[in-house]
Amino acid sequence: MGVKATVVSDTGAYASLGGPVLERACTHAAGPYHYENFEIEGTAYYTNNPPAGAFRGFGVTQTCFATETLLNMMADKVGITPWEIRYRNAIRPGETLPNGQIVDNSTGLVETLEAVKKKYDAALEEGKPVGIGCAMKNAGLGVGLPDWGRCKLIVEGDSKVHIYSGASCIGQGLGTVLTQMVVTNTDLKHEDIVYERSNTWFAPDSGTTSGSRQTLVTGEACRRACDKVMEDRNAGKT
């Protein structure tokens, strides 16, 4: 059994994270199934559309939807249920995924399918509409390249410490995180600190807000900046 896939993505006017998104889309295009042969080709194109950067799922959900739809069509053609075709081809410990990863004993797709089998069959017998789909997201932290976070702590005219970072806060509460880190690593109180929203004019570049990385990398930059603040305060500077 094999899979051949062609993945085309619209990265918009700028590359942004279009490359890594396409990489994830391709490495997960076969889904959580075992194939003896595979050929997967991906291409990202610049267009006049808005940039397509980081988002949850990171390319995996798009190819997953296509793969799962095709499996349902295949099951219909050979006369078996969507559950059965997934169970027969589910990836099992010791087998190899298209990205070269050998899955270990923590892989539980077979057990997951077995757990829903009775309810799935019962729904079919009762004539109820029932669907089934499987997905996985197996990606580690980073791709081996250097990463960075940057942060400035500046005492301004109001005698408060202002936090500057180019890291965008898009709902994950980064401002709260950095403020708390300053409180934790200095002798300052919350009322002594002002978090400045990111801007490209003054705040230092901290890379993308993606993959839950900002708390780790910019948070560490903030902690190191706090060490320098405390060195100055302990030396009598204000």
Go through the PLM ranges and name each one.
Residues 1-61, 126-238:
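Gly/Pro-rich active-site capping loops and adjacent beta-alpha segments
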Residues 51-117, 211-238:
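N-terminal leader/propeptide and maturation segments of large enzyme subunits in energy/redox metabolism
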Residues 87-154:
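Accessory "access/gating" subregions that flank catalytic or transport cores
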Residues 80, 122, 187-188:
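Helix N-cap/coil-helix junction residues
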